[in-house]
């Protein structure tokens, strides 16, 4: 799978990011109900198991109505700040010290694409995020959908967005519920937050 001007990953592919970004936090953003909380919980599980073993049933979640800080520890500790989708109007208050951004979209719900695209464009145009590495995650690939992920990317003109953005952007298809692609997300986070000693 290829994306003009950016990087794309097939399911389970390895994510690579060049170093050089400033130290800081990872922001986890996306509309309400896209699976951000489950993603963070699953990333914790994957990092604690070193990517081995079955993840089992997904843990219970509820919509985030504020902010959650979660530490992911593998080769080094990475703090992920998850902001609830309902907090979209004030996300910009949390952009400072952001080294990386995980933006989650629901691949099973094409009707939500336009709203997610508007949010993404707002993030990419923010000066405070100009140097942040961005990973756009198409979550819920385990659920049936009448559009393929490639059709969704084309519909929101993602290749054009990536070509015009200041940020280094990578895309991936994942299933937080099943664990598909999460080892790659963890590897991307580790590479992005590599210490500059």
From Swiss-Prot:
Belongs to the small GTPase superfamily. Arf family. Its main location: cytoplasm. Disulfide bonds: none annotated. This is ADP-ribosylation factor-like protein 16. Transmembrane segments: none annotated. Interacts with RIGI; this interaction is GTP-dependent and induced upon viral infection; this interaction suppresses the RNA sensing activity of RIGI. GTP binds at residues 30-37, 82-86, 139-142. GO terms for molecular function: GTP binding; GTPase activity. Gene3D superfamilies: P-loop containing nucleotide triphosphate hydrolases. Keywords: Cytoplasm, GTP-binding, Nucleotide-binding. GO terms for cellular component: cytoplasm. It is found in: Cytoplasm. May suppress the RNA sensing activity of RIGI in a GTP-dependent. The gene is ARL16.
């Amino acid at each position: 799978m290829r994306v003009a001007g950016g990087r794309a990953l097939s399911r389970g592919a390895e994510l690579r990011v060049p170093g050089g970004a400033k130290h800081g936090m990872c922001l986890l953003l996306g509309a309400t109900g896209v699976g951000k909380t489950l993603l963070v919980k699953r990333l914790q599980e994957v990092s604690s198991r070193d990517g081995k073993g079955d993840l089992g049933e997904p843990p219970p979640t509820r919509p985030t109505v504020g902010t959650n800080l979660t530490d992911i520890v593998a080769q080094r500790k990475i703090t992920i700040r998850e902001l609830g989708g309902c907090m979209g109007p004030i996300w910009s208050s949390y952009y400072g010290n952001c080294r990386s951004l995980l933006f989650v979209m629901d691949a099973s719900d094409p009707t939500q694409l336009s709203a997610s695209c508007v949010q993404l464009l707002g993030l990419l145009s923010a000066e405070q995020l100009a140097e942040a590495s961005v990973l756009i995650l198409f979550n819920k690939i385990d659920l049936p959908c009448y559009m393929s992920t490639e059709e969704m990317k084309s519909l929101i003109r993602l290749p054009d967005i990536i070509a015009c953005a200041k940020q280094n952007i990578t895309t991936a298809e994942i299933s937080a519920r099943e664990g598909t692609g999460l080892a790659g997300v963890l590897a991307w986070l580790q590479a992005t937050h590599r210490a500059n000693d």
